[in-house]
């Protein structure tokens, strides 16, 4: 997917990027590739692949939601996918990027400073240590972090009631959703939408799962991460 194909795909979904935003995305790409030479950020560094498998993939779910004047937390953001891409493309969205590795946080802050973004913050923390952020967000995202039954317990407590958790998954998404049925019940989550999309170039399937928090969660969740991992809900 060339840059021009990326812009056109966004426009087809009513996302019209300014020249400044286009330049910010390209600078992000350049910083990603340059930093990746000395730090393991991604296995994808070719320009067309970054635009499709990182940038476009990060935006797919956003075409289904109103993001203006909302808050979003991206858990286990890594090199900033999807959260930093969303912050660039939706300047009225307030984004919090959660990442446990300090060196990745340093990279994210470098990009944010370089692009002069004012709607995004980096939180250097494990996702299960975010009690101060409980019930703070309209949306939460996670991409390629863990299986869904584990993610639900970590992420659901961060949502406001009626907030939405979007799990960005590949072709195994529906299998993970079945596996997470008990977790959804215990955490007051319901399936709002399942978005199935194929990437334009290599036809890779993406399954984005939208889970709505219907009411407050029992204060005992999330449990200690070792418990979550050892015995998922």
Residue ranges, per PLM feature:
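Residue-level signal for inorganic ion chemistry
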Residues: 32, 86, 169, 211
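Short alpha-helix immediately C-terminal to the canonical SAM-binding loop
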Residues: 104-106, 173, 177
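Class I SAM-dependent transferase core
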Residues: 1-69, 73, 103-120
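Helix-to-beta-strand junctions that scaffold the AdoMet/dcAdoMet cofactor pocket
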Residues: 90, 159-161
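SAM/dcSAM-binding transferase cores
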Residues: 178-233
